[in-house]
Design a protein with these regions (language model features):
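A short amphipathic beta-strand at an alpha->beta junction
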Residues: 136-138
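N-terminal, charge-rich interaction modules
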Residues: 39, 110, 140-151
């Protein structure tokens, strides 16, 4: 809940509750830097806004990494539309922090370079950790997005783009991710669970979804259900089904159901599908 008014009645909050041990002034003790291709609402709240040219993420990360490594002489006058002096100032702020955190959005994966842009960011964070403490957290939308990555990492050792078709786990982003497989028209059947590919995947991949056997497990009607051959309504975890959700920072949270409905959960549907597949395979032997 976010409020614009807070009343303290019968209590002196400042003297009763302790402030942060390391950042007693809260927001005033923190420096927020926003990097984006345009001035967003978040950028207006930042202390420093760096406007980068579209597709310049990879170059920007590597320029900052070079500065952190002490290679200032090799930096050109501008990198991805950002002046050299701004890069030096930013690097000095990053190095001067006692504890810093990077938050990356899905925009990094939408430009040329895709996952390599994220890797460049991780390498910059790794370089900064040689001097001080830094973390990196991906910011993604929707409910429990991190849950799938956690389960894939646990079962296969990789967070996404996992291919089992070879009989062993194969991981190669750019070849085995959902977008790549659909773009190359390799898939003739797709099972979509709790997400909306129709709203977020490229147009040509969504067009392919409409041509093949697409099945959607979702509590709601979406752009994916519009192109699907079959839509199976399911219960919504946290409302009429219980389960485990992973917070943005990877912390698992068990959620209880608020009420009981007649809708089956994702787990129930997938279990029944798995049982039927095993039954069919046994009959074919």
């Amino acid at each position: 809940m976010i409020v614009d008014c807070c009343q303290c009645i019968g209590i002196t909050k400042v003297s009763t509750y302790s402030t942060g041990a390391f950042r007693p002034e809260g927001r005033n003790d923190r420096t927020v830097i926003v990097v984006d291709i345009r001035e967003s609402e978040t950028a207006k709240l930042a202390d420093i806004f760096i406007q980068v040219k579209p597709g310049g993420d990879y170059a920007l990360f590597n320029a900052l990494r070079a500065i952190v490594r002490g290679e200032r002489d090799i930096i050109p006058d501008t990198v991805a539309g950002v002046e050299r002096s701004v890069l030096f100032k930013t690097a000095d702020i990053l190095l001067g922090a006692k504890f810093g955190s990077f938050f990356t959005g899905i925009g990094l994966t939408q430009s040329r370079g895709k996952y390599k842009n994220v890797r460049a960011g991780i390498e910059l964070v790794d370089e900064l950790n040689r001097h001080t403490k830094y973390t990196l957290t991906p910011l993604r939308g929707h409910w429990n997005v991190d849950g799938t990555n956690q389960m894939f990492s646990l079962a296969a050792g990789y967070p996404y783009a996992v291919d089992y078709s070879r009989g062993i786990v194969h991981y190669n982003p750019g070849e085995t991710s959902g977008v790549d497989i659909l773009a190359k028209h390799e898939a003739d059947a797709v099972l979509i669970i709790g997400t909306d590919l129709g709203a977020h995947f490229p147009r040509e991949t969504v067009a392919h979804l409409a041509k093949i056997n697409t099945i959607v497990l979702d509590p709601f009607i979406s752009l994916s259900t519009a192109v699907a051959k079959l839509h199976i309504p399911v219960a919504s975890v946290g409302l009429d089904a219980e389960g485990t959700a992973y917070r943005l920072d990877g912390v698992p949270i068990h959620v209880k159901k608020a009420f009981t409905s007649s809708m089956p959960s994702d787990e129930e549907i997938l279990t029944r599908i798995l049982q039927e597949i095993r039954k069919i395979k046994a009959e074919r032997k």
